[in-house]
Every structure is written in C-alpha cells, then in structure tokens.
C-alpha cells in the first residue's frame, strides 16, 4: 500500500490549475467530466449501453454550461483513445476534435488501459499487495481481450495488445507476482485462470472522471495530439460480423 500511495502523490505533483473536459466512450459506458486542479466539478455517466451518439453531445453541454456558469475558461479537452469499441472510440474522438478545434484548445489523448489502471491505483479501499501488477482487460470478441500488464509506475511490462486467452496467458507475470485483473474482459478470464496469484477486481469500467491524473500530467508536459491527424488506438483491424443465415449453414 505504501508504494501505491507514493505513486498517487507523484501524480498529484503534476496537477495544474487547468480546466479540462474529459470524454470516454471506449466501452458501453458513455461519460464526461469537467475538472480543475484535479477536482471533479461536473460529471455525467450512462451505463445502459451503446447510446453514445445520442447522449454525448448533451453530456458535453452540461459540463460546458457548468464551466460557463462559474466563469471558467476551458484549457483542454481529453479523450480516451482506446483500445475499446470501434464505434464508441470514433464517436468520442470526433466530438473531442470538433470541440478542441472550435474552442482553440489543445487535445489530450488518454490510453484506455492506463485509464483503467489509474482507477484501481487510486482506489485506496482495495487492499492490494505492494508488488501487485495491474492487468486491465477489455472484452474484444470470443476469448479475445485488449490487455496489457503494468507495474506500480504505470510502466507497461506487456505492451497493449489483443490477446486470445488460454490457461497459459499471463503465466510469466503470475509466476512471481500478484496480478490484479479487472475490466469487462476479466469475466471470461476468471473461470479459466486458476492461479493463486491472480486477484480479480470487480466493477471496473473506463470513466471520464478517472482520467484526471493522466490528463493533468499530459497537460503539464505539453503532450497534445494533432487534431487533424490523430486516430483511435484500435490495436486490431475492424472485423465485420457476418449475419447468420436463416437457413443455417451447409
């Protein structure tokens, strides 16, 4: 727990007085958040499914109205870049680009897997070992997930990638470390993984309100996206699903 808290303090040192609008549409959850100096001032979330196209503009307006009502000037827009839902990522990035361009503010990209790790790291109600590794998992299709493995400094030990799960997955990390698995992809991994060093953290989804530390750090470093040419981090090519024939297969 000591190392985990020190890492959180390290992030807090990077906080600025910037007012940032955060957008996440990487999974079936649609969310926005307005923050200043790391404090959440306004947030909107919907967990009902793929309603991003219908809801996102309204969520953004609520946050911008809050900023205007409190005489705050937006300094940047942050958006989750993926991996995740192809359609969701496109919707979120398109809205973020348009807003950043219209308001003439920088655009910040946040890796969705790192966003999920940040959520777990900052949840001090979790009693995790000091040497724990973090393995976020986003459901892809069948037994495939988007995943990576990170240490306490958010350094990727397994680079973000699509992974087809089997009983040997993550073996090199589980051999000598406790590994915390979380995200909607972990639900299909838990029945397969029987390793005693595996811990499963429930109910972890990417949320705009968890982007604060990562977005603030990027803002303080001047790490901004090219509004015109930035694209989502899909990690794999889109594969359209063939409609099932009503006559079956032969």
Language-model features, listed with the residues they occupy:
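Polybasic, lysine-rich low-complexity intrinsically disordered segments
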Residues: 4-6, 10
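DPxDG-like acidic metal-binding loop motif
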Residues: 78-112
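Surface "functional belts" at beta-alpha junctions
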Residues: 12-16, 39, 51, 106-206, ...
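N-terminal beta-alpha supersecondary unit
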Residues: 13-81
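Acyltransferase
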Residues: 201-250
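Conserved hydrophobic/aromatic positions in well-ordered beta-strands
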Residues: 33, 146-150, 233
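Phosphate-handling active-site elements
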Residues: 65-74, 100-110, 125-129
């Amino acid at each position: 727990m000591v190392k985990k808290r020190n890492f959180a303090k390290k992030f807090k040192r990077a906080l600025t007085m910037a007012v940032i609008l955060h957008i996440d549409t990487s999974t079936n959850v649609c969310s926005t958040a307005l923050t200043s100096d790391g404090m959440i001032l306004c947030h909107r979330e919907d967990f009902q499914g793929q309603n991003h196209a219908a809801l996102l503009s309204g969520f953004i307006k609520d946050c911008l109205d809050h900023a205007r009502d409190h005489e705050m000037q937006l300094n940047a827009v942050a958006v989750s870049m993926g991996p995740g839902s192809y359609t969701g990522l496109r919707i979120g990035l398109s809205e973020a680009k348009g807003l950043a361009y219209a308001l003439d503010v920088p655009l910040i990209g946040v890796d969705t897997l790192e966003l999920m790790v940040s959520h777990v790291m900052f949840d001090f109600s979790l009693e995790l070992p000091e040497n724990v590794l973090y393995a976020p998992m986003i459901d892809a299709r069948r037994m495939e997930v988007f995943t990576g493995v990170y240490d306490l400094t958010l350094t990727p030990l397994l680079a973000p990638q699509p992974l087809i799960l089997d009983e040997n997955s993550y073996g090199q990390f589980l051999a000598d470390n406790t590994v915390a698995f979380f995200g909607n992809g972990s639900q299909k991994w838990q029945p397969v993984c029987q390793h005693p060093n595996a811990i499963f953290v429930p109910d972890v989804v990417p949320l705009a309100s968890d982007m604060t530390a990562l977005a603030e750090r990027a803002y303080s470093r001047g790490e901004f996206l090219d509004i015109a040419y930035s694209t989502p981090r899909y990690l794999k090519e889109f594969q359209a699903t063939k409609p099932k024939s009503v006559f079956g297969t032969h």
